[in-house]
Structures are given as structure tokens and as C-alpha cells.
């Protein structure tokens, strides 16, 4: 975790506690190359250090809707994908990342890649490539998907023109983020999702999947990212803002004060307790 992760966690925790809800800690470890049990345990330790307690979930999957570790939930994702297959909107895609991100590939005005439909039926004819496993994509509609974000306000996204058909399962068998979080949020009864505003357009993709799977979407709240001194979003490479560094230089109360001031909850970055923020 880094400062940005902790900021999102705090804002989500405060929202849930103020509304009398239940805070779920889900371990999203879909990428085996970047996920280890010790990393998840460290996240739990960092949250406890700050005083952020959860009502369900965690590595040990306490609660009625477990397991709360995504790598243990493949059966749920497989069932959801089967439901989407039945709509006739999914198809195999043999495109590689390198092919899709070539300079000639279509991009949105902000530089975001738009899938051009290379393998979309009926273009798939003759497209299957021997010895190359396909990913699974879903056809998106050429219409506006609208929703009101609790922080960013009214939103309208045309998936076909701004994102394109997106992946549900990667060629290596890993489940895509969009399918996994929609399935999990629906089955776990999640009613509010709070996260960084870099994922704002993901909400439209997820709402589309909610529609197809017959679930009610949650409310979305996308908070501004914390940026470094160069105006770039934080990453694990920012070691000075890692939890290890922050715990060495701050008390829980002083770090809470810093984050609460960043959120506009208090006038200055002075130490504060969670009770005083509620």
C-alpha cells in the first residue's frame, strides 16, 4: 500500500461508518505475478495500524459471502461468464497486447486505447491463430450509459466509441477486473463503491455487465487521486510514500490528520483520531 491506497480506504471507511453500513475487505489478487499472501497480510496490518476495521472479509474470509480472496472465487466468475456467453455477446479475441497498442491503433482523445473490433463477429472468420490462446471479449452497445457519481456528478459514456469491446477473461486464463468486481460486488451485496477517479470510466463498463447479469448496480463515488510532486499518480515506486516509510515517520493520528486535511475534512493537517472524524 501507499498513501493513495490508504486515502481511498479511509474515505470509504468513513462513508460506511457514517451511513451505518458494513465495510468489506476483499483481497483482489487476480494477477498471480503481483500477488502474494504476505502482501495481503501486510495490507491487513497497515489498516489495523491506522484503526480501520472491517466487518467482512480479509485473508481469512470472515463473513457470510466468502471467500473474500478473488483467487479463490473462480467458480463464481466462471458462472457469470457462462451467463454472458448465453447472451451471444461474447467472442474469442486473438489480438496480442503489442498488436493492439501499435501506433496505428485507435485511441481516444486522452490517449486511452479503443479496441477496434478486429476479432468481433463477423470479422473473426479466418482470424483464429494456431497455437495462440484467445482472450474473451464482450460486445458493447453504441449508446450512452449514464449514471450519477456521488462525487463527480452526472456521467455519460458511450462504450462503443470511447472504450470498445472489453476483455472478460485474458488469454492466460486470468479473470479480468471488470467481470470479477461486478460478480463479487453483486454477490456480496455491495451498495457503495468508493475508489480513485482514474477508474471513473470503469463504472460504465461495470454498469453494462450489471445489466446483462440482472443485478442492481451500486452507487459509485470516485475520489480525486493523490499525486506526487511531479503531478503524477502515486505508485509502489514512490518509496517515500510507501506504508513502511509512512509508519516510520508518522503516528496513526498524524497520518489521519494529513489525509483528513487532504480530503477537506479539517482545516489543517493536525493529528486527529478516527472518532473525531465521524
Residue ranges of predicted features:
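A short, terminal or domain-edge coil/loop segment
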Residues: 48, 79-89, 119, 143-156, ...
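Non-catalytic terminal extensions that flank enzyme cores
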Residues: 18-23, 50, 57, 127-129, ...
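Alpha-helix boundary recognition
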Residues: 82-86, 186, 247, 260
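Structural motif
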Residues: 1-3, 172, 249-254
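Polar, glycine-rich mid-to-C-terminal structural blocks
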Residues: 89, 135-137, 266-267
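Alpha-helix initiation and N-capping motif
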Residues: 40, 74, 78, 97-100, ...
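Active-site cores that bind ATP or allylic diphosphates and position pyrophosphate for catalysis
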Residues: 98-235, 242-246
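N-terminal Rossmann-like or analogous alpha/beta NTP/dinucleotide-binding catalytic cores
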Residues: 1-108, 197-198, 202-215
Amino acid at each position: 500500500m501507499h498513501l493513495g491506497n490508504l486515502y481511498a480506504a479511509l474515505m470509504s471507511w468513513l462513508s460506511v461508518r457514517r451511513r451505518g453500513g458494513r465495510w468489506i475487505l476483499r483481497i483482489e489478487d487476480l494477477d498471480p505475478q503481483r500477488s502474494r499472501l504476505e502482501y495481503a497480510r501486510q495490507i491487513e496490518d497497515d489498516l489495523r495500524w491506522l484503526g480501520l476495521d472491517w466487518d467482512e472479509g480479509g485473508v481469512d474470509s470472515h463473513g457470510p459471502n466468502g471467500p473474500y480472496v478473488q483467487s479463490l472465487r473462480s467458480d463464481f466468475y466462471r458462472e457469470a461468464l457462462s451467463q454472458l456467453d448465453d447472451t451471444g455477446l461474447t467472442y474469442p479475441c486473438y489480438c496480442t497486447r503489442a498488436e493492439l497498442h501499435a501506433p496505428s491503433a485507435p485511441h481516444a482523445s486522452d490517449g486511452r486505447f479503443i479496441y477496434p473490433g478486429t476479432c468481433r463477429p463477423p470479422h473473426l472468420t479466418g482470424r483464429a491463430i494456431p497455437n495462440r490462446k484467445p482472450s474473451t471479449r464482450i460486445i458493447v452497445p453504441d449508446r450512452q450509459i449514464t449514471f450519477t457519481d456521488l462525487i463527480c456528478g452526472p456521467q455519460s459514456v458511450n462504450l462503443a466509441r470511447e472504450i470498445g469491446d472489453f476483455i472478460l477473461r485474458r488469454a492466460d486464463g486470468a479473470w479480468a477486473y471488470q467481470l470479477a468486481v461486478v460478480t463479487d460486488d453483486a454477490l456480496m451485496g455491495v451498495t457503495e463503491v468508493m475508489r480513485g477517479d482514474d477508474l471513473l470510466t470503469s463504472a460504465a463498463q461495470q454498469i453494462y455487465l450489471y445489466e446483462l447479469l440482472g443485478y442492481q448496480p451500486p452507487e459509485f463515488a470516485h475520489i480525486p487521486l493523490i499525486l506526487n510532486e511531479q503531478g503524477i499518480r502515486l505508485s509502489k515506486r514512490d518509496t517515500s510514500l510507501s506504508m513502511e516509510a509512512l509508519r516510520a515517520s508518522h503516528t496513526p493520528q498524524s497520518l489521519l490528520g494529513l489525509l483528513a486535511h487532504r480530503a477537506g475534512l479539517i482545516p489543517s493537517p493536525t493529528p486527529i483520531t478516527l472518532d473525531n472524524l465521524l
